[in-house]
Structures are given as structure tokens and as C-alpha cells.
Amino acid sequence: KSMKSLSIILLLGAIYFVFQSFMSKYLFETEKQVYRVVKKEADFEIRYYPEALMATVYSKGTNYKSVASSGFNKLAKFIFGGNQQKESISMTAPVRMSITDNGSSMSFVMPKKYNNQSLPTPNDPNIEIKKSLPEYVAVISFGGYATDEKIAVAYQNLVKILSEKKIITKGGYKLL
């Protein structure tokens, strides 16, 4: 009986080790969009993001769940070979989302090795490929999975902090 328990524990340990190895490899190998921290405080930071090539889908969705599911599925299909060249494109971070009452978008930053000419052409005509404008963004973090409620609370906290520090903002918010 104790030998069987030991075997189960060893098997669970091996599964855990393989999972952790896979996640570590995925997290460390995922290309991240380059940015420069301009100002860092305890509860927020201001970053400068240079232009980047993006694949974007637009949506009429006005909540996180609807925009995330429809946008992610379309973009994932594109990078997993749903393009004219049938080429897989590496996933990058962060995934960008903009949610407003007038419409929303989700964007994947394309790996640095691509430009407008070398990036595979999406099969889905609703995927727009373009360069983002360089921008300064104020960033606040929150833990766990994103929900509309968590996003609203984080946004209000960031607006309050920036207002108290007399930092003038322009435009809406994005999820990174």
C-alpha cells in the first residue's frame, strides 16, 4: 500500500515538474514588446512604447468577456497558421485590448522579425495589420483574471493617482 502511495506521489511530482518546465519555457521564450520605464512609483509606472507592427480585430462588444473571446479566437487562428502562407507566428506579450461604448479592439504585437512586407497575410479580412503609434502609457497592475469589475476598479484607481500627482492624461484606457 505504501509503495502504491509512493508511486502516485512520484507520478504527481513528475507531472508537476513537466508542467512547471513547460510554463517556465513558455514564459521566458515569449517575445515581449520593448518599452522603456519613464517613471516608476510604488503603485503605477509610466512607460514609453515605440511603434510596433500589430494585428488587430475590431468588435462591437462593450465588455471584457465578449471582446476577449471573439478577438482572441480570430487573432489566434491567424498566428496558428490561418494566413495565406500557412505560417505559424510566435505569440508575443502583451495582448492589447481597448474597450469603449463605441466599439472595441484586440491587438497582438507581431514578433520583431516581421515587417509589413514579410508578415503573412491573414485569411480573415477583418484582421487589420498596421503599425501602432509610439505612445506613453500609465500602467497599473492587478492580480488574478481580468473582469469588467476589476478593470473598472483599476482604472478608477489609476485616474485618481494620476490626478493627485497632477499628471494630465489624453485618451481612454487599454488593457495590456
Q: Where are these predicted regions, by residue range?
A:
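A solvent-exposed interaction/effector surface
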Residues: S2-L176
